[in-house]
A protein has these predicted regions:
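Conserved hydrophobic/aromatic beta-strand scaffold that supports enzyme active sites
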Residues: 19, 30-34, 95-97, 105-107, ...
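Short beta-strand His + acidic residue motifs that chelate non-heme Fe in jelly-roll/DSBH
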Residues: 113-121
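Short beta-strand segments enriched in hydrophobic/aromatic residues
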Residues: 35, 112, 132-134
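A short hydrophobic beta-strand segment most commonly corresponding to one strand
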Residues: 49, 122-138
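Alpha-helical and His/Cys-centered functional microenvironments
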Residues: 25, 118, 133
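Double-stranded beta-helix
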Residues: 41-109, 113
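Conserved double-stranded beta-helix
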Residues: 1-53
Length: 141
């Protein structure tokens, strides 16, 4: 658990969390407690409903990602969709946007496709952030 302060200080889109991505190849969760109201221009959480479910297409994407990752040591650890405006808009149209009042608690399986929404310059979003990421290879006794 940690206090998370996200501050947008310029208009450059250098925040990789704003690209749709899967955190891991297995189920994990993250949660946020909004300390302040979060509007559309405050960087709300976006989530593609049911994207955490395993499908044949998803398995192929994970396999391709793992092969690319094995040959490129500078490759990002999580699978990220390109940040083209066309891809973002298409996904934004179907994403659930968590625009909520303060004291709202949001929990998501981050094996699903998600991102941080865009925010205006000089915007601050304060949350209490929780996450759980177990080792998928641990031996169960």
């Amino acid at each position: 658990m940690s206090l998370e302060k996200i501050e947008t200080v310029n208009s450059l889109n250098l925040d990789t969390q704003k690209n749709y991505h899967y955190d891991t190849f297995y189920s994990t969760f993250k949660a946020w407690l909004y300390i302040d109201d979060v509007e559309l221009n405050d960087g709300p959480f976006y989530y593609i409903k049911n994207s955490h479910k395993i499908s044949f297409k998803r398995l192929i994407l994970e396999w391709i990602f793992s092969i690319r990752r094995s040959f490129n040591k500078n490759f990002d650890d999580s699978f990220r969709y390109g940040n083209s405006l066309k891809n973002q808009k298409k996904l934004n149209d179907i994403a659930e946007k968590f625009i909520d009042k303060k004291n709202t608690f949001i929990m998501a399986n981050t094996h699903g496709l998600h991102r941080r929404g865009d925010s205006n310059v000089n915007t601050v979003r304060n949350t209490i952030h929780f996450y759980s990421r177990e080792n998928p290879f641990k031996i169960i006794q």
